[in-house]
């Protein structure tokens, strides 16, 4: 079984009770469309479940998420499965894991593209990260997540975006 790895979800300065972060409905729709919802599991089973799922996917790894930058989409203590992806297959809205220049692993969503790489941002952060994701620092894309609580934010945001015609189905929660 793969050893647990700590993944910093890049601590945000904002609090969870007041959602700061990404306001663009277009970006939120892409994130909801291309980032998997967390599956609910029993307390204490998050990482074990993610490790079992990762073991069934070639090259996949399980990580333990900490921090507030992806809240309320993914709460702290959400375990994630990260699957390798070709750099050219990355799309806006995917939530990827990359290695920052200081060596920390970060899970954030793709919100744009520049000549130097992809812009990424935590859904709870007001600005994109200072560093971009490129072929050298990309680890993979989140393909599954396991948590003990449901994301009310995801449910409410999905319903709002479906009502406005921004996404096609409410089957994304």
Where are these regions (language model features)?
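Bacterial N-terminal signal peptides that target proteins for export
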Residues: 1-7
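Extended hydrophobic leader/signal-anchor segments used for secretion and membrane insertion
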Residues: 9, 18-173
């Amino acid at each position: 079984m793969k050893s647990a790895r700590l993944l910093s979800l890049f601590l945000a300065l904002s609090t969870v009770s007041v959602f700061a972060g990404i306001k663009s409905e277009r970006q939120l729709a892409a994130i909801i469309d291309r980032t998997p919802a967390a599956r609910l599991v029993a307390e204490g089973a998050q990482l074990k479940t993610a490790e079992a799922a990762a073991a069934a996917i070639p090259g996949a790894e399980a990580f333990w998420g900490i921090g507030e930058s992806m809240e309320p989409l993914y709460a702290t203590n959400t375990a994630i499965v990260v699957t390798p992806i070709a750099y050219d297959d990355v799309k806006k809205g995917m939530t990827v894991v990359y290695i920052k220049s200081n060596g920390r692993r970060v899970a954030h969503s793709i919100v744009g593209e520049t000549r130097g790489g992809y812009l990424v941002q935590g859904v709870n952060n007001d600005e994109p990260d200072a560093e971009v994701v490129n072929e050298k620092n990309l680890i993979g894309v989140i393909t599954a997540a396991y948590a003990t609580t449901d994301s009310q934010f995801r449910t409410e945001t999905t319903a709002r975006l479906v009502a406005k015609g921004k996404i096609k189905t409410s089957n994304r929660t």
